[in-house]
């Protein structure tokens, strides 16, 4: 269905967010048709923390990066790279901060982590 819409001559622009393999198929399917194309494809967004970072702020950045919207965003910080010299301290702070996250109703503004769809 998606390819039928993307290749339809009445469609002037295709915007797709999803997997790299499907993005490649879409790009191949509309090649040569003169359509505008925007692809936001799967990847692994990394949080990188160096030893000169303000660690508490970096912890908050990591928490927001992975838990915002239950992690269901295309740019969720799904990888964490920490300079070796601060890794132990940073991970300890991150673990401590994670224990304070409030799990509950995603519609409650005070909830940090709500329900996650697994199907």
For each predicted feature, which ranges?
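ALDH superfamily catalytic-core signature
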Residues: 13, 19-119
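A structured beta-alpha segment of the ubiquitous adenosine-cofactor-binding alpha/beta core
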Residues: 1-15
């Amino acid at each position: 269905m998606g390819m039928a819409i993307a290749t339809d001559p009445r469609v002037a622009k295709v915007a797709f967010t999803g997997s790299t393999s499907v993005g490649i198929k879409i790009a191949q399917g509309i090649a040569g048709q003169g359509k505008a194309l925007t692809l936001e494809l799967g990847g692994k967004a990394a949080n990188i923390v160096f030893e000169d970072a303000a660690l508490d702020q970096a912890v908050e950045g990591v928490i927001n990066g992975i838990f915002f919207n239950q992690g269901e965003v295309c740019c969720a910080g799904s990888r964490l790279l920490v300079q070796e010299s601060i890794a132990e301290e940073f991970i300890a702070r991150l673990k401590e901060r994670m224990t304070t996250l409030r799990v509950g109703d995603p519609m409650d503004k005070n909830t940090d982590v709500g329900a996650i769809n697994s199907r």
